[in-house]
Amino acid sequence: MNQVMDGPKTRKLILQLVTGAVVGAAVTYFFLENASSAADLEDPARLTAVAAGIIYILMGAIVAIGAIAPGAGAKFLNVEDAAEIVEERGKLAPSAIVCILLGVMLLALALTPGGDLPGALSRDAAAWVAAGCFAALVVASLWMRGKIDEFNRSLGTESAALALYLSSLLFGGWGALAHLGYVEWIAPLGLLAGLALLQLAAMFWVVGRRGLLMPR
């Protein structure tokens, strides 16, 4: 496969990278500036959950905007043209919803009281938000079952298997060391955030290995 990119594809890749970096940095800075006074974001587990939540929400929002406005989406999503977005809208919409729900759930759990800070959400409120997001994730997953073709299903299966191997290696090894007293066991929220980030990393690895991250 010829991986050499022409001028327009190179410009599109640069635009995607720069736009993603700027938007991600701006959203993260704004969030940390406004949430650090209420939530204990010096806790590594909470900070990891916030980072994972922001990443998932931004991914979902970008895909959702692209699905709603195909003309604009064709400029920053990795598609041939707006017509492809229209054709794939049935897959893009539920995928965007899943990402946003997962991100909201992680952020809600991270913003509960901790340390000497009251938290932006009470534990009860965060529990309700997390439960609602989880229920919606189940519904969205069932909704997506009939909308995913065999190729995308194989990508999902492969990335899920890789994420399982990575999480077993990382958290299994960590658990063994914690049992022996060499390290402290990871906080539950850190475990959830770590699993979410590993799934994301596995997904990018799988689609990248298939050449699907190259600008089109």
Question: Model features per residue range: what roles?
Answer:
Residues E42-I62, L117-F134, L191-L195:
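Alpha-helical transmembrane segments
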